[in-house]
Amino acid sequence: MKLTKILIASTAMAAVAGMANAEAHMANDMTIVSWGGAYQASQIGAYSDPYLADHPGLSIVYDESSAEAVAKLRAMNEAGNITWDLVDVEAADAIRLCDEGLALEIDADEVLAAAPDGTSATDDFGDMLVSDCFIPQIVFSTTFGYRTDQVPAGVEPPDSACDVFDLETYPGKRALNKRPIANMEWALLCDGVAYEDVYDLLETDEGQARAFAKLDTIKDQTVWWSAAAETPQLLADGEIFMGSTYNGRLFSVIAEQNQPVGMAWDWQMLDLDGWIIPAGLPEDRLARVLDYVMFATDTQRLADQAQFISYGPARASSAPLVGKHAELGIDMGPHMPTDPANGANKFVNNYAWWADYRDDLDAKFQAWLAQ
């Protein structure tokens, strides 16, 4: 018995010493790049606060530059000075960064925790692993919110992305993202193009011209946003009637802020968001990031994030653990973009297509905006 206690104590001391030794070789500060607003707050609540509780000597700084991540990482790489440690990006940007060698390739089963039942990370994330550099977190959608108190009398509220183009039925200012993704698809879909033909058509000059012509019909009534928090604020202030943003942002303004805002789910664009690790980090910074990522993407942590925002967890094992909102106590399941009741029509961001065409269409879109 005495020997057993000694062995157990020795083993425990060795484990503690091992953890301390590993911690000693990790950086004591970390810069995480995200999107700000309700989404970043959900990451802090589900990932960073619990991680910091276990690592009191660590300092985490958030940089709200995810929208410019590709351009800024290119510039950092050119200058040979990578100041970011972990970057939250959409899947299409992760593919581009990976293709350009600006993001670290990972082995998911080495870097990410297995599910509680032993299912490998590769199997648990499944099709969400769209790039060798991408570490999935959430499924979200880009959809539309509208002011319920500005719906004309006797008119049904908008329920589709296509209603944004109907200025006659729904007069008032719009808000759209200042980039081509989703806007180009909506323009063609709402101009009568079948979804299965959208991307083939967008590869042609004629298809692009048709999309821009459709967007021209609302251009002078549109506020163009670059930060996802802008549309919820414009809606809350009553400065627009209808605008696009991420579904979690709309959930926040509706459920948490009690603003007179509704959601039009039909033709929402489903998307993936997650982490990339910049290539070329020093060993101590990389060790810290890998430790944080394994913690922040485990089954429980991804389920915990859904307590703060209505984005679906990217792990299959996390979905059954999604429960009620941390403060409001409401069931979060019906507020997820993947709920079958939320829109008869939806489409998934064509990540590979946008990775190939993004730079070209970005330039054309900005030139069109400047006209």
Where are these regions (language model features)?
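Gram-negative bacterial Sec-dependent N-terminal signal peptides
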Residues: M1-A22
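Early extracytoplasmic/lumenal segment of secretory-pathway proteins
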Residues: A24-R96
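Extracytoplasmic ligand-binding site segments that recognize negatively charged/polar headgroups
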Residues: G37-I44, T83-W84, V89-E230
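A ligand-binding cleft/hinge motif common to bilobed small-molecule-binding domains
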Residues: D93-R96, M242-P260
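A bilobed periplasmic-binding-protein/Venus flytrap-type ligand-binding module shared by bacterial periplasmic
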Residues: G145-Q150, L188-L189, L272-R285, D304-Q307
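Periplasmic-binding protein-like
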Residues: Q208-T217, E256-A279, L328
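Mature extracytoplasmic/periplasmic domains
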Residues: P278-N345
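Conserved C-terminal helix/tail region of periplasmic/extracytoplasmic solute-binding proteins
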Residues: T338-Q371
